Amino acid sequence: MENTLGLEIIEVVEQAAIASAKWMGKGEKNTADQVAVEAMRERMNKIYMRGRIVIGEGERDDAPMLYIGEEVGICTQPNADQLCNPDELVEIDIAVDPCEGTNLVAYGQPGSMAVLAISEKGGLFAAPDFYMKKLAAPPAAKGKVDINKSATENLKILSECLDRAIDELVVVVMKRDRHQGLIKEIRDAGARVQLISDGDVGAAISCGFAGTNIHALMGIGAAPEGVISAAAMRALGGHFQGQLIYDPEVVKTGLIGESKEANLERLSSMGINDPDKVYDAHELASGETVLFAACGITSGNLMQGVRFFHGGARTQSLVISSQSQTARFVDTIHMAGQPKTVQLH
């Protein structure tokens, strides 16, 4: 799967990032997201595959495209029987976030990206649109830190695993009222906190790379993005754990349903019978082969954002494979239109 789809998915996230970047700084987050969705879907439908969206832009009734359950790829088109050989057909599950950090794009802030993860059919956890408690850490701390331990305990473990003083550690936390206690505990333990307004996928992945100066991600964010982060961290060999949050009181919002009871019923209907289960990266991205791809929209810790020039754009992307255990950064020049002839007099 890596050999056939690796380059293709890079182009998918590149096209989404370029489309969204044209709306950078214009204050229109919905448009920045919409054009990314359209560009991503258009490029996906040119790939020789039968793909199914398991994490996307929402339920079918709420999203016109890249909705959960939508099929994409050449082999899902009306004339697929003429184009695709069933014996060669690649069936995959896809998790997408065409514009991770819509507010970041709208206001010209760093860290937004177009991201996706793919695996063979059944290889990605179809997370509900709930919140998720998350813990990400570098490979050296894999299996040693634990989401059920306090932040103070985990920082001591991180310090030992990384051979760094606690006051040298940087923990990324989303700037939300629900995290006030967590932020205080991290600071009281002696570590430093980097607050972000949106986009925790990039923060989670940064834990997997040396030199990013990010040593952990802690706190509660969106569950679908947790699966995408887990896919990348599994391939990187980093630590990732997630636990679904189904009680609106925990996050002080009704976005995950009106009541704890209703949410428990919804989880049960999805076949999730242990709502308090802590998932690791291999459970959230369980496929034999997992591929992750991202392209910077605005510049961040890992990647440069889209840079436009007359007649084209330059992008920086990242593709991570669990199969080959590689992470490749790809620098691409996109040339649009016909070159102009310069006449000298």
UniProtKB/Swiss-Prot annotation:
Catalytic activity entry: beta-D-fructose 1,6-bisphosphate + H2O = beta-D-fructose 6-phosphate + phosphate; D-sedoheptulose 1,7-bisphosphate + H2O = D-sedoheptulose 7-phosphate + phosphate
Disulfide bond annotation, renumbered to this chain: none
Binding site for Mn(2+) 1: 33, 57
A Pfam cross-reference name: FBPase_glpX
Taxonomic superkingdom: Bacteria
Binding of Mn(2+) 2, residues: 97, 100, 225
GO molecular function: fructose 1,6-bisphosphate 1-phosphatase activity; metal ion binding; sedoheptulose-bisphosphatase activity
Cofactor(s) the record lists: Mn(2+)
Gene Ontology CC entries for this record: cytosol
Positions that bind substrate: 100-102, 131, 176-178, 198-200
BP terms from Gene Ontology: fructose 1,6-bisphosphate metabolic process; gluconeogenesis; glycerol metabolic process; reductive pentose-phosphate cycle
Keywords, ordered alphabetically: Calvin cycle, Carbohydrate metabolism, Hydrolase, Manganese, Metal-binding
EC number: 3.1.3.11, 3.1.3.37
UniProt-listed SUPFAM superfamilies: Carbohydrate phosphatase
InterPro entries, alphabetized: FBPase_class-2/SBPase
Pathway it works in: Carbohydrate biosynthesis; Calvin cycle
Summary of subunit composition and partner proteins: Homotetramer.
NCBIfam families xrefs: glpX (TIGR00330)
Record PANTHER family: FRUCTOSE-1,6-BISPHOSPHATASE 1 CLASS 2-RELATED (PTHR30447:SF0), FRUCTOSE-1,6-BISPHOSPHATASE CLASS 2 (PTHR30447)
Protein's job: Catalyzes the hydrolysis of fructose 1,6-bisphosphate (Fru 1,6-P2) and sedoheptulose 1,7-bisphosphate (Sed 1,7-P2) to fructose 6-phosphate and sedoheptulose 7-phosphate, respectively.
Family: Belongs to the FBPase class 2 family.
Name of this protein: D-fructose 1,6-bisphosphatase class 2/sedoheptulose 1,7-bisphosphatase
Source organism of this protein record: Trichormus variabilis (strain ATCC 29413 / PCC 7937) (Anabaena variabilis)
